Regions:
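Ubiquitin system architectures
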Residues: 1-88
Length: 88
């Protein structure tokens, strides 16, 4: 099933959809296609908790019942700047 996500970083907001069975790493690849930053320079968060690249979106709590087109799941995005990641 599809999940719908709002990915936010500062003033940038991306609306994306993915399969509930997609991994967090696969979501990072989608973001890479849009923002041109590789997955290793990205960190994704849900409710201020860092998401594990190997987990599926469903395992992270983004289910088709929760992340709807009219009420998408919110994902925080941080980029690596120099040696550290920026705050969300």
């Amino acid at each position: 099933m599809d999940v719908f996500l709002l990915i936010r970083r500062g003033k940038t907001t991306i609306f994306a959809d993915a399969k509930e069975s997609s991994t967090v790493f696969e979501l990072k690849r989608i973001i890479q296609g849009i923002l041109k930053r590789p997955p290793d320079e990205q960190q994704l968060y849900k409710d201020d908790h860092l998401l594990d690249d190997s987990k599926t979106l469903g395992e992270c709590g983004f289910t088709s019942q929760m992340a709807l087109p009219q009420a998408p799941g919110i994902v925080g995005l941080a980029f690596r700047e120099d040696e550290a990641f920026e705050d969300v």
